C-alpha cells in the first residue's frame, strides 16, 4: 500500500463544498497534463473525507510515457468491465474525442464538404483555445485512470447513493448519539450551542408525534478526543414548540422539497391488457366446452356400466338366492313365534287372580316377619339418633382437626426415612470432583461395605461414625450419596429437623426405628444431614448455669440426643451400620457425640482448589451444550473460594443467558455475563450516566487496567493482568475491572517489588485523571485510593517490608478476637464499645510515624505512575475512547492498542482519526467461535497513522 507521503505528493486533491448534495472534483494540472486545461468533474460525495486507495502494480516504464496498445489485463479495461458506465464511450482520434457514430462517419470520408467544414472548425477552435487558454472540455474517468494509474485516490462515496439534504438530516437524527432535553437546556444556559438544525414543518401533522433536531455544540478548550460536538435530539411536538420559543441562538431549518407532476393520465383499460384478457377468456371458454363434452361421454359409459351391474345383481337375487333361503327363514320364524306364545301364557297365569302378590302377603302375615319388624323399631330409633349426634359433632370440629388412633400414633412415631435399596442414589465417586482428600478418606468405608467379612476375619473394627464438616455447598451430601452408590447397600437419609415434633418421645422413637431398619438390612448407611439441629450442645455442660434444664422442649431434644448416643456406641451397638453426619456448625455439636467411638472420623470438606474447580466445571459443562471456545481453566483460576454448588450455579446461569440471547451453545460472553451476575449483580437498566460521567468512570478504570499492562510490558512485574474492563452498571457498582488471578504461591509469599507494583495499579485511576483532565480530578477513584492507603500501611506496619526494616509490632485486625458472641443487648452501649477489636499501639508516636511513612510511599508510587501514563498518553486516550464506544473491552484489546500506539506517539495522530472509538480487532475467543482469524477492515490504517 502506498505510504502517506506518496498520498500527499500527488497532484490530485478533493475539495468538499458546503452543499452536501453535489461536490466538485478538481483535477490539478501535472507534468503529463501540462498541455491540457483545467477540467472539472462533478460527482456526488458526502461530507465525510474517507478515501479509498486504488493501488495496482505499474509497468516498468515511467509515468510520463503512454502505451498505445494496452494489454489485456490493463487496469482501466478491467475497471470499466467490472463497473460498466452509463456514459457513451468515446474514442480519441488525434486531439479530439469522438463517439462510435461520429468515428464511423469520420472514417467513411465520403462527404468532402463536411470534412472541410470540420477542418475549418478545428482550426478555429485551436486558435480560440490558444488565445483564451481557459476553455473547458469534458474529462472522462478512463483518461484519468490511465494517466494516474496506480496513484489515484477516489472517495468511496462516489459509488454510493446520492442523499438529499432532507435524507441526510433523517440519517443523522437516527445515527448520532441522543441528547436529552435537560442536557440541551444546560448547554443553552452555558452558551455552548453553536447551531440548532431542524426540518421545516409542513401542514401535515406528525404521525409519530415527535420532531428531530441536530445540535452542534461549541468546542471547549481541552482534549478534543473526549468531546462530542454533534448530537441528535428527538422531542415531542409540544416540547419542540416550547423549545423553539425559548431558544434564541443560531438556527437552520431544512426546507421540504415538493415536486409536482403533470402528464397524461394512462389509458384505462390498457389496450394490451384488454387484448390479453379477451384472449384468456376465449381460451377458458374453449377449455370449458371440451371438459363438458368429455364429461357427457364418460358419464354415458359409466351409467351403462352401472345399469348392467345392478340388473345382473337383481336377477341373481330373485331367481337364485331367494329360493334357497326361503325354507330356512320359515323354520326360524316359526320357532321364535312358538316360544313367544308360551311365555305370554305363563305370565298371564301368574298375574291372574292375585297370583304372586297373594302369596307374598300370606308369607308376611303368617310367617313372623311383621312381629320382627315391630321389635326393630326402637333399636333403629336409637341408632339413628347416635349417627345424627356424631355427624353434628364432626361438623363442628376446627379445620386443623386431626384424628388420633392407635395405628396412626404408631405410624407417627416411625422414622419415615427415605430409604434407597441397593444404594440407588445415582451418584458415584466419578461424579464427585474437587474434594479428593475427603474421597480418599472414605475409600475404606466403601471397602468395608462391599466386603465386611474380610474386616471381621482380621479383627479390624471399621469406623462406626463419620462426621463431614465444611462450608455450605462443598459436597458433603454428595459424598455421602457416593458412598452408598459405590458400595451398593441400602441408604437411609434423614434431616436433623425431622426428629423434632410437638409430641414428647417422638424424636427418640424415630431414632430407634431408623437404626432398627438399618440393622435389619445391614450392611447399610445412615445419613443425617444438618445434624446440628438434632445434636446441639446440651444445657449446663461445662457451666454451672441450669436455668433451662426443666424446659419441656429442652428435655425432648436432649432425650433424642441421648437415644442417638446410645445407638452409636451403647450396649447394643449394631455392626455393619455406617453412620454419616453432615454439618457446617461443628462448634454447636455436643462433646459426647464427637468423642472417639461415636464419630471415629472427622473429615473436613474444604472448598476446592483451582484444579478441583476445573474438574467441577468440566462435570457440569458436560451436561449442557457448551462451545469449544470457552476456556474453563480461566474461570477455575479466577474464582477462588467458590464451592461446587456455586460453580454448578454458574454453568446453569450461563445456560440461561445463552437461551435469553438465542445462542445455539454457551459462549465465552455468556460465561462472563453469568460471572458478573453472580459476583456483582445483574445489569441496572434504569441507571444511565451522562457522557461526562461515563468519561470519568472510563478514565479511572482504564487507568487501573492499562497501568498493569504497562508494568507487565516494560518492568516485567509479577502482577495480575487485566481480563476485562466494563462501564456497564451492575449491582452496586458503576464500572469494574476484572483481573486474571495468579497462582496461590504468589499471594502466600508476596515480595516488596510485587506489592509496590500493585500499589501503582491501585493509583492508576487517579493518575489517569490527572493526565487527561489535569488538576480537575474527581472522586471516581476513591475506592482504589482507600485500598492503596491500606496496602501501603500493611507494607510498613504488618508485613514489615520497609527497607531498612523497621519493626512496628502492630497486630493485624484479623488476628484479634472479639470478647462476645452475638450482638450486644444494650444498643446504646454497643455504639461506643469497640469489643477489643482495636488495641493501642506499642509506641504512642507510632500512628504519626506510620501515617508519614505511608504518605511518602504513596506519593513516590503516584509520581512514577503519572510519569508512566504521560509517556503513553495516546494509548490511554485511545483505550478510553474505545471503552466509551464499546462499553466493555478485553485485556487483549488493550495489548493491541499498546502495540499500535507505542510510547511518545503524537496525540495528533489520534485526533486525526475519523472514528477514534473504533478498533480493528477481534478478541481471540470470538475468533475461535467464528473460526475466522482475519482482523476487521477499517477505513484508516493504524500503522500508517502511527
Swiss-Prot record:
In the N-terminal section; belongs to the AAA ATPase family. In the C-terminal section; belongs to the peptidase M41 family. The chain crosses the membrane at residues 289-309, 320-340, 369-389. Pfam families: AAA, AAA_lid_3, Peptidase_M41. It comes from Arabidopsis thaliana (Mouse-ear cress). Keywords: ATP-binding, Chloroplast, Hydrolase, Membrane, Nucleotide-binding, Plastid, Plastid inner membrane, Protease, Transit peptide, Transmembrane, Transmembrane helix. GO terms for molecular function: ATP binding; ATP hydrolysis activity; ATP-dependent peptidase activity; chloroplast protein-transporting ATPase activity; metalloendopeptidase activity. Disruption phenotype: Embryo defective. The keyword Hydrolase applies. GO terms for cellular component: chloroplast; chloroplast envelope; chloroplast inner membrane; cytosol; plastid; Ycf2/FtsHi complex. GO terms for biological process: chloroplast fission; chloroplast organization; embryo development ending in seed dormancy; plastid fission; protein import into chloroplast stroma; proteolysis. Residues 1-54 form a transit peptide. This is Probable inactive ATP-dependent zinc metalloprotease FTSHI 1, chloroplastic. ATP binds at residues 470-477. It comes from the Eukaryota. The lineage of its organism: Eukaryota, Viridiplantae, Streptophyta, Embryophyta, Tracheophyta. It is a multi-pass membrane protein. Its main location: plastid. It is found in: Plastid, Chloroplast inner membrane.
